[in-house]
Amino acid sequence: MKGTREAEVFGINRYRNRRVDGHVHTELCPHGSGDKTALMVEKAIELHLEKICFTEHAPLPVEFSKVYLGDKKALDTAALTLDQVETYLALGNDLQKEYGEAIDISLGFEVDYLPGFESYTRSFLDQYGPVTGDNILSLHFMEGMAGGYWCLDYSPQEFENAFGPWIDQQDLLYGRYFETLLKGVRTDFGPYRPKRIGHLDSIKKFNRYFHWKPELDDKSKGLVLEILRTLKSQGRELDYNLSGLSKEYCGEVYPSRYIQGMAYVLGLPYVVGSDAHSILDLQKTWGPGAAILDAQAEAHEEGDA
């Protein structure tokens, strides 16, 4: 092993010994780089990826704005709008036709779990599930101190505005996050429920900023275990999201090494995801020196020992 931080990637890779990126965004992402998606596909081919899964942020329900209390820009740039969905699907289909002989391209959505809006999400999946694959369920919004919902990953300042005194109660805040995620995992989203759970512990994105401890308390450990057990029983899988490595106040894979170990013991598979929003993100994850395959190879050696 070459001592890279990607050594944290550990567990049962559903695409063992294959170069597959299961979490990538497109030129349509409102908080992305704007890089042309065709050029991202060409970069993926150059990096010898066998498969790339586009998982653009699914539109949020219009009514959600009434219970959202955070920064307006965070909401406005969070996801596609409903009138962009067909454009996104057409883009993906065009890319499949253009590059399909060189790389397997999957088209799906990253869907938000929003308590109180489950029927909207199920309706969306019922409509678009038949024409998509590799959909991901993620938690980007959570109820704050004053009620209402706030974006979890927009900025440290927004996080402080949302959770106030809870900032000094890390265990309480983490507990609320994992309780919410568990509800999402248990929710019946129908036959087209997302097969993967995105960046499972992204609550830690600002850990270093708030000087939080890296360890989970016993309550959070129990909640995570229940989440993983539920996913295993449902035949679902984890998004091993490498974007956390490049986040200024995180510096870790989502999920943590500890959670990776729990998932491995349970036999819960994962798929590596760059969460790329740009060509550079793909390069950083899969290019020379990233050693992602070396990390996976070492993980398998540990598991087979």
Positions of predicted regions on the chain:
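Extended substrate/RNA-proximal surfaces in nucleic-acid metabolism proteins
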Residues: 75-230
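Glycine-enriched alpha-helix->loop->beta-strand junction motifs that scaffold or abut catalytic
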Residues: 50, 129-134, 236, 267-269
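Short, composition-biased local secondary-structure segments
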Residues: 2-17, 198, 225-235, 260
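Active-site-proximal loop/turn and secondary-structure-junction residues that shape catalytic pockets
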Residues: 26, 58-59, 111-113, 141-143, ...
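Active-site-adjacent C-terminal substructures of enzyme catalytic domains
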Residues: 219-220, 224-276, 281-282
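Conserved, mostly hydrophobic/aromatic
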Residues: 23, 44, 135, 199, ...
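An N-terminally biased module of ancient metal coordination in phosphate/nucleic-acid-related enzymes
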Residues: 1-115, 119-123, 211-218, 267, ...
